[in-house]
UniProtKB/Swiss-Prot annotation:
Catalytic activity: pyridoxamine 5'-phosphate + O2 + H2O = pyridoxal 5'-phosphate + H2O2 + NH4(+); pyridoxine 5'-phosphate + O2 = pyridoxal 5'-phosphate + H2O2
Natural source organism: Chromohalobacter salexigens (strain ATCC BAA-138 / DSM 3043 / CIP 106854 / NCIMB 13768 / 1H11)
Positions contributing to FMN binding: 62-67, 77-78, 84, 106, 141-142, 186, 196
Protein name as catalogued: Pyridoxine/pyridoxamine 5'-phosphate oxidase
Presence of the UniProt keyword Oxidoreductase in the record: yes
Key words, A-Z: Flavoprotein, FMN, Oxidoreductase, Pyridoxine biosynthesis
Record's subunit section: Homodimer.
Amino acid sequence: MNYDIADLRRDYAGETLSVESAPASPLDLFQTWFAAAREHETQDANAMTLATVDSQGLPHARVVLLKQLDDKGLVFFTNYQSHKGSELTNVPYAALVFWWPTLQRQIRIEGRVEKASAEVSDAYFANRPRDSQLGAWISQQSVEIPDRDWLEERKQRFEQVYGEQTVERPPHWGGYRVLPFLLEFWQGQPNRLHDRIRYRYHEQDAAWSKTRLAP
């Protein structure tokens, strides 16, 4: 199978991004860009690629949804017993990528990862649709299963178990917070002369530095 995709390209012409105009905190710039993405992207502005590594150093990536953002970092929720959960237990670092094609913008993030508090996970779980709450019990994420009937049978079983009762959060399900130490903002520009601004966190000074990178 051979696809000729060498000619797949587009022109870029976004807003100018400079070190001088960028705020001191990258999370402030992230919030500004994220608000614009929510306004202009057709759907899933909070979708982000999450990359982790296993115990052998092999990378694995998948798309997850950003569900909370605060001064500490970015939060997503998942099954702690999944492949990514196991990888984050062994190597508690991750990379994130947001891509917003309408705005011609990308944000790349690297950071340390910690579990969100039980209070944060409980509060988010309580606001999920009931079917999604049950799904957290039904699916043994990343485990090989024989067929879809296996899922449907577990669905019926848990619906009977809970009936009209409140569905509690499973102990194996909850949030992770990515604590960034690097953020890179990319803005598409004409002639492939794109704008790239990189922030690094310096723990000793408890401060961010920012610099411009060649495209």
